[in-house]
Amino acid sequence: MSTHTQSITGRHWKTGDWISIEFNQKKILSISSAAHGSMNAPWLAPSLLDLQVNGYGGVDFQKKSLSEASLMKAVEALNRDGCPRFFLTLTSSGWPSILSKIKRIKVWRDNNPTLRKCIAGWHVEGPFLSKEPGYCGAHDSSVMEDPNPEKIQALGEIIQTDPTLLTLAPERPGSMESILHASQLGMRVSVGHTNADTACLSAAESAGATGFTHLGNACPQKLDRHDNLIFRVLDCGSWMTGIIPDGVHVSPALFRILHKLIPLNQIYYTTDAMSAAGATPGRYTIGNIEV
C-alpha cells in the first residue's frame, strides 16, 4: 500500500486562519498553521453530515424500483459533492411500505462496507404528519395516519441500534405515547409538518421530543400575525432546530431572525435534498409532484 503523503493549504472554514493539512490515504496526519497563500486557495472544512436526504444524483430513495446499484450511485454523488455521511430519509407512504423499504435497504447497508460507512442512520419523515394544506408540504396527504407504540416497536425491531430520527405531528392521536416509546427505544423524535398548539408542543417535549424538522418550511404561505407555528416553536422549549438555508424554504430575513433567537448549538442545517439535487437538468419527482 502506498504511503505517499500529500498536503493542502487553505483557510480554516471557521476562523479564516491559514492552515496546512497533511494527509495520507485519506487520513489526516497533521494540521498546522501556514503562511498566507493565494487568494484562490480553498476554504478547508470537515465533510458534511446531512440529516435529511430523500434522494440524490437522479436517484429517488422513495421508489420501489430502488436498487443497491442505484443507491451506490447516489452515495458516490453525495461523496463527490462533500457529503460522505447522511441519514437516508423516507417520506410519507403507508406504514407497512415504510417498514418494507427500510428493511430492504438495511440489508444492503449492513452487507456493503461503503453503504454502511455513508448511511449514518435513518430519518423517517411520515406518515404521522398533518393532513392540513400547507403543513403537509410535498407529502401525500392521503396516506397520513396516526402513530401508536406498536408501529414504533415494529420500526425499532428493524433498525435495532441504528441512529434514527423520527419526525411526526404531535397533534395526531397516539403521538404522545409513540414519542415516549420511540425515545425509550433510543430514537430521536423531532416535531414537524404540524400545526400543533403551544400546549401540544409542550406535551411533546415532555414526552421526549427534542427537535423540530426544517422550521419555516411545511407551513402555509400566509400565517396569522398573532398566533402561528413559528411563534409557538420559538416560544416553547429548547428544540434542536433544523433549517433549510437556501433562501427559498426560509427567507433571508427569517434566517437571520432565527439565528438571533435560537442558540447556535441548537441549530442544524439540512438540504432536504431530493433526486434532482446533484443531477443533470431534467424532470424528477418529489412525492407525487414532478419538478
Model-derived regions: residue spans:
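Divalent metal-binding pocket/active-site signature
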Residues: 124, 129-228
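Active-site-adjacent C-terminal substructures of enzyme catalytic domains
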Residues: 200-291
